[in-house]
């Protein structure tokens, strides 16, 4: 790319942008650099790319964060579908549909209830896990204190 400017990896966070997608390593955004981030939306493409304290600070600044286990669930969906013999086209279509639906649901829930997208995502995940477990023998234990 002859027209591009090469940056040091630590300078990438200083770029003013609309959407910032940390997609490689955990804890890329942390308490030491979160104030340098100049964006409107963070889509967590990596696993745990933002520390909890940094995510709370972004929320205080009005910067929306789509949690990692919502934004990067495509790999899990792909693996499950490939295991069952789905075609590449079907896998890509399903990933797109599920990620859009889950993201929309989490953001709407967060907005309506006045909670963070992460809190809404955790509640959605717990609801789905409980429902899935109710179909199995684990349902016998679902009333135990502290059980998912």
Q: Over which residues does each language-model region extend?
A:
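A structured beta-alpha segment of the ubiquitous adenosine-cofactor-binding alpha/beta core
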Residues: 1-32
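Adenosine-phosphate binding glycine-rich loop
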Residues: 23, 35-148
């Amino acid at each position: 790319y002859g027209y591009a400017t090469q940056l040091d990896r630590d300078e990438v966070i200083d770029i003013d942008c609309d959407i910032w997608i940390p997609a490689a390593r955990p804890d890329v955004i942390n308490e030491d650099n979160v104030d340098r981030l100049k964006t409107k939306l963070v889509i967590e493409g990596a696993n745990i790319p933002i520390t909890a304290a940094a995510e709370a600070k972004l929320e205080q600044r009005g910067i929306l964060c789509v949690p990692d286990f919502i934004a990067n669930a495509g790999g899990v969906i792909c693996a499950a579908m490939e295991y069952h013999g789905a075609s590449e086209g079907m896998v890509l279509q399903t990933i797109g549909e599920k990620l859009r639906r889950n993201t929309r649901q989490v953001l709407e829930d967060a907005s309506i209830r006045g909670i963070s997208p992460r809190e809404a995502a955790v509640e959605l995940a717990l609801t789905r896990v409980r429902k899935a477990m109710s179909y199995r023998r684990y349902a016998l234990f679902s009333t135990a204190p502290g059980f998912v």
